[in-house]
């Protein structure tokens, strides 16, 4: 009986430990990483403030750090980001998508907006 209780508790604890980012959340985070990377590499002449490039790079770092913290392997994360970057690289700045990504970070990562601000400050 103790063995079964231990197995059930172990299973529950394991599932709770990996509950930080669902597949849907991962997809959104990868899409946002692709959008942010595209923002950073916008061609010259595109209307875009330099501070937004910094915020984009900081956001990518915060998303990756959080993903690794909740148990996503670096290899899996990088593969997802690379696909998203391929999808968005060379596209024009999309303010709506970028703002949606800011909201995703603020709402799905504990202290996400503050973490982005902190990383931006370290870029100088």
Each language-model region and where it sits:
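Sec-dependent N-terminal signal peptides
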Residues: 4-14
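Residues embedded in well-ordered secondary-structure elements
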Residues: 21-22, 90
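Boundary at the C-terminal end of the N-terminal hydrophobic targeting segment
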Residues: 17-19
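Short N-proximal segments of mature Sec-exported proteins
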Residues: 22-72
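Compact alpha-helical subdomains of small soluble proteins
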Residues: 51-124
């Amino acid at each position: 009986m103790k063995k079964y209780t231990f197995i059930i508790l172990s299973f529950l604890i394991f599932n709770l430990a990996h509950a930080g980012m669902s597949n849907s959340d991962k997809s959104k985070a990868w899409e946002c990483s692709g959008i942010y990377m595209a923002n950073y590499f916008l061609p010259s002449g595109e209307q875009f403030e330099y501070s937004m490039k910094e915020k984009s790079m900081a956001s990518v770092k915060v998303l990756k750090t959080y993903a690794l913290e909740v148990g996503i392997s670096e290899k899996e994360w990088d593969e997802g980001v690379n696909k998203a970057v391929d999808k968005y690289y060379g596209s024009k700045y999309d303010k709506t998508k970028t703002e949606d990504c800011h909201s995703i970070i603020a709402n799905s990562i504990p202290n996400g907006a503050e973490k982005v601000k902190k990383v931006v400050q370290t870029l100088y």
